[in-house]
Every structure is written in C-alpha cells, then in structure tokens.
Design a protein with these regions (language model features):
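Positively charged, helix-rich recognition surfaces that bind polyanionic ligands
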Residues: 1-154
Length: 154
C-alpha cells in the first residue's frame, strides 16, 4: 500500500508479507484468513492516517494467456491459489464500511512500471506498483472532476 497526497507525493508505504500461503499443502482456509486480516490491517492503517480515497487494482482485468500466467510451475500455482475476486470484493466492502471512496484502476503495466521505478524511489516492487496504481487513480480523479466542472458550465 502506498499513501499519496493529492499531488501524488508518497507520504507513507506499508507492505504485508505472508509467503507461506503459496506453499504446497498450506490450508486454503488459513491462507484466506491471513490475506483478509492483512487487508483489514492495511485499511485500518490508511483510515487512521487520514486517507479518504482508496484505489484498488481492478483484478478482473488481469487475464491469463493460454491458461497460464507465467511459464513456471511455481508461478502458475501461486496464481491459481490466489482468490483475486474474493479479495477484491472483501476489500471494497471493508473500505466502504470505513467510509472510503473506492475506485478500481486498470492495472495494466503497473507492475512493469513499478519495477522500473522501484530503484529510483528506493522502494520494493510492490510498494512502487502501489504508487503507480495511486497515480493512475489520482489522474483519473483529476480528469473526471475537471470534466464534471465543464459539464456544470454547459
């Protein structure tokens, strides 16, 4: 998670790691519980730091190519074990309960750009990808609000 101000400046970053959930034989129910609790902690952290808008990757836009996400067995297992729809729905519900405005952002290219920016920003790849998602969301909001103002004057 990256917390940005209205100008797109990073104010804070927070990452939750739990690599064990992708291990072969790790119980799916326990993995789900770990993911959802981590998401709750991140949203609580954002709430108590004055965040009002949350941008989530629109995970439904991530498509698999030929039934595979990547070319490695380990990567394919991780992708197939990841309950993206469930996590997104739960995240949206929890964010709305906390009073956040919620927007979904097309994640296309965010990981690649995040990887490229990570060295310059001195952040890990996940935090820099979250930064890119935040910038895309802020750009959408600024563009959308600008077009709404134009509509009011017509």
């Amino acid at each position: 998670m990256a917390i940005l101000d209205g100008d797109g400046i990073i104010r804070d970053v927070r990452v939750e790691h739990f690599p064990e959930v992708n291990s072969p034989g790790f119980p799916k129910s326990k993995a789900k519980d770990l993911r959802l609790k981590a998401l709750s902690r991140l949203l609580d952290y954002a709430y108590y730091h004055g965040v009002s808008v949350v941008f989530f990757e629109d995970l439904s836009m991530i498509k698999r190519k030929g039934g595979k996400v990547v070319r490695s067995k380990k990567g394919n297992r991780k992708a197939s074990n990841f309950a993206k729809k469930e996590l997104l729905e739960h995240g949206i519900t929890m964010a709305l309960k906390r009073g956040f405005e919620v927007f979904l952002v097309n994640p296309t290219g965010s990981s690649k750009l995040g990887r490229e920016l990570s060295r310059g920003l001195d952040l890990d790849i996940h935090s820099s990808s979250a930064f890119v998602i935040g910038l895309l969301g802020l750009n959408y909001l600024k563009t959308h609000k600008h077009s709404q103002k134009e509509e009011q004057f017509r």
